[in-house]
Amino acid sequence: MNEVLAKGKKAKEIARELVLKSTEQKNEALSAIADQLILETAYILEENKKDIEEGKAKGFSDSLLDRLMLNEQRIVDMTEGIKQLIELRDPVGDCVSAWERPNGLSIQEMRVPLGVVGMIYEARPNVTVDAATICLKTGNAVILRGSSSAIHSNKAIVAVIHRALKQTSLPQESVQLIEDTTRDSAKQLFTMNDYLDVLIPRGGKQLIDTVVREASVPVLETGAGNCHVFIDETADKQMAFDIIINAKTQRPSVCNAIETIVLHEKWAEQYGSELFSSLKKRGVELRGDQKALAMDSSIVLASEEDWGTEFLSLTLAVKLVSSIEEAIHHINTYGSMHSEAIISENEENVSKFFVSVDAAALYHNASTRFTDGYEFGFGAEIGISTQKLHVRGPMGLPALTSIKYVIRGNGQIRK
């Protein structure tokens, strides 16, 4: 039996054990993982350095290297996320609803673990910690399959997690890493219906599209983040500047950074040139339509492809519109249903934007950078879903549960 099948079979066995573990036991395991990550920070960073050096040798972009890179602060941030997770209510065993039928049957809708979660992801080794801990909290076994670019980091983190779990009542194999990073291992994971209950892809558009297209296992789709901010005619200048600069430049390589600004022409007439200048001073390359070029000749003419691109870098598309309806049409045409924002003092337009724009998270007068499990108060997230079935938006603890119905009677038979 090869690695993928062997780990799938083991995960199925472990899932039956995990469903019996108490919240206290699961939290003890999470606490042990947080402590072990701090204890072995030097080891993790040493292994991460190998990935960074190999990435540089292969010519990885700065944005990809940033997603790949770990440092002491990022490891501390991981452990803080775990501590938040410990404090969160365990949804497993919760009674979602309960009712009694006229025949005396008592019916309860209960939350239960999904079972075995498969996670396939690119570059970011912090996902290894997020996925492992949120799955453990919800009583799920997890099979991790990262990319070759982060293999040293992922192997180190999982080894640390195993050493932590060895000190607890949870089996070490609750968290397993597929070390084979070839396409064959990924394709096998896609079709492992006998062992996987759900597969979650987390990465770029190409990875996600491949998983959605080829997997026979149920998929929780975490979409790419082609996010927009629409600056309405009534938008406050300073607020607009602050939000745009934050949403684009704070960390351009993440999925909740913006890729296009949509400007109302009347607002742009007053403040557009100054906004463009402010962005360029921060190293942002602007790609705009003809109206934007007429305001600033240094802007590169945007191609049709640019409007639908998740740049994940300091590149920003600029679209000028004459109405909110035109803005909404552009966003719904090119957006990825992730996070979209409007900056406006016109409540009617805000309401229209909220009703008409199709996305997991909609913002009024705030940065899209808040679409995140930590910022929503969920603790560590396993991804941001852009699909509509099962769950949408940042996927916290309830997203990794299903339901079962528990029916109690006193001898009823159906007539």
Curated annotation (Swiss-Prot):
<dbReference type="GO" id="GO:0005737">
    <property type="term" value="C:cytoplasm"/>
</dbReference>
<keyword id="KW-0963">Cytoplasm</keyword>
<dbReference type="InterPro" id="IPR012134">
    <property type="entry name" value="Glu-5-SA_DH"/>
</dbReference>
<dbReference type="InterPro" id="IPR020593">
    <property type="entry name" value="G-glutamylP_reductase_CS"/>
</dbReference>
<comment type="pathway">
    <text>Amino-acid biosynthesis; L-proline biosynthesis; L-glutamate 5-semialdehyde from L-glutamate: step 2/2.</text>
</comment>
<keyword id="KW-0641">Proline biosynthesis</keyword>
<comment type="function">
    <text>Catalyzes the NADPH-dependent reduction of L-glutamate 5-phosphate into L-glutamate 5-semialdehyde and phosphate. The product spontaneously undergoes cyclization to form 1-pyrroline-5-carboxylate.</text>
</comment>
<dbReference type="InterPro" id="IPR016161">
    <property type="entry name" value="Ald_DH/histidinol_DH"/>
</dbReference>
<keyword id="KW-0521">NADP</keyword>
<dbReference type="InterPro" id="IPR015590">
    <property type="entry name" value="Aldehyde_DH_dom"/>
</dbReference>
<dbReference type="InterPro" id="IPR000965">
    <property type="entry name" value="GPR_dom"/>
</dbReference>
<dbReference type="GO" id="GO:0004350">
    <property type="term" value="F:glutamate-5-semialdehyde dehydrogenase activity"/>
</dbReference>
<dbReference type="Pfam" id="PF00171">
    <property type="entry name" value="Aldedh"/>
</dbReference>
<dbReference type="InterPro" id="IPR016163">
    <property type="entry name" value="Ald_DH_C"/>
</dbReference>
<comment type="similarity">
    <text>Belongs to the gamma-glutamyl phosphate reductase family.</text>
</comment>
<dbReference type="InterPro" id="IPR016162">
    <property type="entry name" value="Ald_DH_N"/>
</dbReference>
<keyword id="KW-0560">Oxidoreductase</keyword>
<dbReference type="GO" id="GO:0050661">
    <property type="term" value="F:NADP binding"/>
</dbReference>
<dbReference type="GO" id="GO:0055129">
    <property type="term" value="P:L-proline biosynthetic process"/>
</dbReference>
<protein>
    <recommendedName>
        <fullName>Gamma-glutamyl phosphate reductase</fullName>
        <ecNumber>1.2.1.41</ecNumber>
    </recommendedName>
</protein>
<keyword id="KW-0028">Amino-acid biosynthesis</keyword>
